[in-house]
Amino acid sequence: MSNRMWGGRFASGPAEIMEEINASIGFDRRLASQDIRGSLAHVAMLGSQGILPAEDVAAIEAGLKSVEAEIARGEFVFRRELEDIHMAVESRLTEIVGPAAGRLHTARSRNDQVATDMRLWVRDTLDALDAQVADLQRALAETAVKHAGTVMPGFTHLQSAQPVTFGHHCLAYVEMLARDRGRFRDARARLNECPLGAAALAGTSFPIDRHATAAALGFDRPTANSLDSVADRDFALESLSAASICAVHLSRFAEELVVWTSAQFGFVRLSDGFTTGSSIMPQKRNPDAAELVRAKAGRIIGALTGLLIVMKGLPLAYSKDMQEDKEGTFDALQSLSLCLAAMAGMVRDLEPVAETLKRAAGSGYATATDLADWLVRELNMPFRQAHHVTGRVVAAASERGIGLEELSLQDMQAVEAGITDAVFAVLGVENSVASRTSYGGTAPDNVRRQAEGWLEKLGPVEK
C-alpha cells in the first residue's frame, strides 16, 4: 500500500527495508512540541489571509491542541509507517477533525516545516544551555571567592611553573565559559529567522504572510531566500561548533579533576556523590563523573564532524541526507547539558586540600621567576641577565636537593654577589601570589574582586 500522504504517484508501498531506513520517527518525535507550535502559527496565518475558512482553522487548532495533550500524557502512538513527526501529527489530526486536517499543509512542505522545527528546537536548547553555563560560572565564582587565597601550583607543560591561587584557576574557566555563552548567543541570533512558507524550495503561489508566521513563533524575521531556507543547516553546525568548544573547556577541567583527585596528586577531594567504586579493588574511589564528561566531549565533537561531512557534498536544495542532522544534534546538545550539570555538581562538591596544594606550589622551584624579578627591581639587572643568574641559582639548589628558600645567602652570593637577605621575602609562595597585582593576575585581592564582580554580573539562580 502506498503512503496516503504522498503516495498518489505510486502504485505500491515501499519495501520493508526502505520503510526502516526512511523512517525518522524514532528520533524526530522529540520535535513534536515544535512541530505543533509551527502548525498552529501556520494555520492561524492561513486563516487571517483568507486562505482557509474560519471553521477549518478552529477545528485544526483544537485538533492540534488535542494531539499535543495526548503526547504530553504519553498516550500518542508513534508509528514507523508514518515516517516522521510531521506525518504522525497530521495523521492523528485527521482522525480527530476529519478532512479539514488535509488543509493544514496548504502553502507548506515538509522541507520548510522540518527546518522550522529544528530551528525552534535548537533555539530552545541553546537558551537552556546558556542558563546551565551561567550556573556553572556561578559555582566556579563562588568557589573562587572562598579560595581566593588558597595557594596552588600553576603549571605549564604539566610542570610546576609559578604559584597561583585555586580561586584564580577557577576564574580561568569562568572566562572560557563566558566566551562559550557568547558563541551560543551568536548562534541563536543567526538562527532566529523563520523558514516556514519557503515551501519545498521555490516559495508558494498562495498569498501567505511569512512575517506574521515568523513573529508568531518568536523569530526576528522570515528567511530571505526560499532555496537557502530549506537547504541550510548552518544553524545546527554553528550550534554544534559552539557546543564542541564548550565541551573542550569542560573536558580540560574534567581532566584536571581526574589528575587532582589521584593519590599521586591529592589536590582535591570529591564526595561519594561524584565517585564510584571498583568491583574488585575495595579501596578505589574513581572520578567517573569527570571521566564521562571528558569522554562525552569526543562524542559532541564527533556530531559536529559528522554533520559537516553530511552537508559538504549536497546540491541545493533539500536532500534526504539532511535527515541525518537530527540524531547527532539532539545527542550532542543533550550530552552537553548533562556534562554541564555534572560539572556544576562537582564544582560545588569538591574540597581543595589546602596543605597539599601549598606544598606542591613551592615545589619545582616555582618562585624562580620571583627571584629573577627581584634581581631586576633591586639590582637594576636586565631581565635576560637576571634569567641567567636565576638559572644558576636554581642549579645550585638542585645540586643540593633543596628548595630556593632553603639555599643559603652565601651560596646565592657565590652566583651573584649583589644578592642580599632581602631576597628571601619573595621566595615564599604566599608572597609570590600576593605580588601578582597586575590586572588579571593571581593576587588574592584581585581574585576576590573579580569573583565577586562575576557573581554580581551573573545574578542569583533563576527559579
From Swiss-Prot:
Main location: cytoplasm
Gene that this sequence comes from: argH
Pathway the protein contributes to: Amino-acid biosynthesis; L-arginine biosynthesis; L-arginine from L-ornithine and carbamoyl phosphate: step 3/3
Taxonomic path: Bacteria, Pseudomonadati, Pseudomonadota, Alphaproteobacteria, Hyphomicrobiales
Originating species: Methylorubrum extorquens (strain CM4 / NCIMB 13688) (Methylobacterium extorquens)
Catalytic activity: 2-(N(omega)-L-arginino)succinate = fumarate + L-arginine
Major enzyme class: lyase
EC number(s) given by UniProt: 4.3.2.1
The family this protein is said to belong to: Belongs to the lyase 1 family. Argininosuccinate lyase subfamily.
Any one GO cellular component localisation term in the record: cytosol
The keyword Amino-acid biosynthesis is assigned to this record: yes
Keywords, sorted A to Z: Amino-acid biosynthesis, Arginine biosynthesis, Cytoplasm, Lyase
Biological process according to GO: arginine biosynthetic process via ornithine; L-arginine biosynthetic process
Subcellular location: Cytoplasm
PANTHER family cross-referenced by the UniProt entry: ARGININOSUCCINATE LYASE (PTHR43814:SF1)
Protein's name in the database: Argininosuccinate lyase
